[in-house]
Design a protein with these regions (language model features):
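Short, well-ordered beta-strand segments
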Residues: 54-56, 158-171, 180
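Extracellular/luminal low-complexity segments enriched in Ser/Thr/Pro
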Residues: 181, 191-198
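Extracellular Ig-like/FN3 beta-sandwich strand-entry sites
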Residues: 91-95, 138-140, 159, 187, ...
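C-terminal intrinsically disordered, low-complexity extensions immediately downstream
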Residues: 174-176
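Short proline/glycine- and polar residue-rich coil/turn motifs
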Residues: 62-65, 181-188
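Substrate-binding clefts and catalytic carboxylate motifs of secreted carbohydrate-active enzymes
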Residues: 1-133, 137, 150-154
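Short, well-ordered loop/turn and helix-capping segments at boundaries between secondary-structure elements
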Residues: 6-10, 167-169, 198
Length: 199
């Protein structure tokens, strides 16, 4: 998704999938690669690790191929360094920060922190902006439950289950006789489909 977003125009045009983007493709887990890949449509990208000095790289293009090639910062993520800082009471300092620059100015920023202990469940509607839902008995939408730590970082590595239930004029799309839906958490999230009632 972000690889495709990095190919879009830099200038915002009527909000139609345009504008500057920078995205760190690393979840800061024990299994994340040491090399940090950043997708961007900016002129250059700055990456700072754990509050250290930023390293800036130009966003290259590939003649006859991608308009903007992903930027790779070799050996930027070190899980053992993260662990050392966390054990030393400095877990708040552990983060990757990418800034996208156009014309020498920072225009977009993305920050990634490792997830800590799971504490919350965040529910979001997965639907297009500007698309209205109607209580007509046939509109269906997806609800996504994400397991997060206290700061709101999604806990990607966990094996929990989420039990969904609905109250009011709506129903879960499920085969369960009691109307609930149990979903395993995959990569930090679990979806459910809800049909609105006719009221």
């Amino acid at each position: 998704y972000y690889a495709f977003m990095s190919q879009r125009p830099q200038k915002t045009r009527n909000g139609l999938g345009s504008g500057p983007v920078v995205h760190i493709a690393n979840e800061c887990t024990p299994f994340s690669p040491e090399d940090v890949t950043v997708f961007s449509n900016c002129d250059s990208v700055r990456l700072s690790v754990n509050g250290g000095p930023p390293v800036e790289k130009k966003v290259a293009s590939c003649p006859g191929g991608l308009k903007r090639v992903p930027v790779v910062f070799p050996k930027a993520w070190d899980f053992m360094e993260n662990k050392k800082l966390a054990r030393g009471g400095k877990e708040g300092a552990v983060k990757l920060v990418a800034e996208g620059l156009i014309g020498g100015k920072v225009v977009v920023r993305h920050e990634v922190r490792p997830a800590r202990r799971a504490e919350k469940i965040r529910l979001t509607l997965d639907r297009e902006d500007g698309v209205d839902l109607y209580a007509n008995g046939s509109d269906v939408f997806a609800v996504v439950a994400e397991v997060t730590d206290g700061r709101g970082t999604v806990k990607r590595l966990n094996d929990e289950e989420i039990v969904f239930s609905v109250e009011g004029p709506a129903e879960l799309l499920t085969d369960s006789p009691d109307g609930t839906l149990t979903q395993p958490v995959k990569w930090g999230s679990a979806p459910a489909l809800v049909r609105l009632g006719a009221k």
